[in-house]
């Protein structure tokens, strides 16, 4: 939206794409959603992280995008239904090789490209954790806000898994 315009190429922390519309302490906002998740229990929506824009060494997008995104969404739906397994990693569950339908795009998404798409770059994730800690401190805590302890605990657990 026009309300969310920012500098191009600069990481913008925007919780749930709601930053322009959160009219109170973001820590309270997060706490509300954490509480909602607890109330919903097993009925809470599953959360998935997808990077449609991962690039190779030459700056080319590795995933074809557009309608082919449905191939990943199909895997997500199957995970939600409990009809397909996943590989547990430090950052969560990833598709097992062969579980994303690549029929018809084998020339675009080769086994080597798929390996790169599913690769967990621990150093990159550790940098992300450091950036999140900086964001929590400088952009929220130092400005009078607060962070729910559960979010800090999740960062700590993620960092611990990455260090194994």
Model segments located where?
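Conserved NTP phosphate-binding and transfer environment spanning the P-loop NTPase/kinase superfamily
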Residues: 1-164
């Amino acid at each position: 939206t026009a309300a969310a315009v920012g500098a191009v190429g600069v990481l913008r922390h925007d919780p749930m794409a709601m930053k322009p519309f959160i009219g109170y302490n973001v820590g309270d906002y997060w706490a509300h959603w954490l509480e909602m998740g607890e109330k919903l229990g097993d009925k809470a929506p599953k959360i998935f992280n997808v990077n449609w824009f991962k690039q190779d060494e030459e700056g080319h997008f590795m995933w074809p995008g557009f309608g082919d995104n449905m191939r990943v969404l199909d895997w997500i739906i199957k995970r939600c239904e409990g009809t397909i397994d996943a590989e547990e990693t430090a950052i969560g569950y990833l598709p097992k090789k062969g579980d994303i339908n690549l029929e018809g795009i084998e020339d675009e998404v080769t086994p080597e490209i798929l390996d790169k798409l599913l690769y967990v770059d621990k150093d990159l994730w550790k940098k992300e954790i450091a950036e999140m800690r900086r964001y929590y401190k400088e952009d929220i805590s130092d400005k009078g806000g607060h962070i729910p302890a559960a979010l800090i605990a999740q960062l700590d657990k993620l960092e611990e898994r990455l260090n194994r």
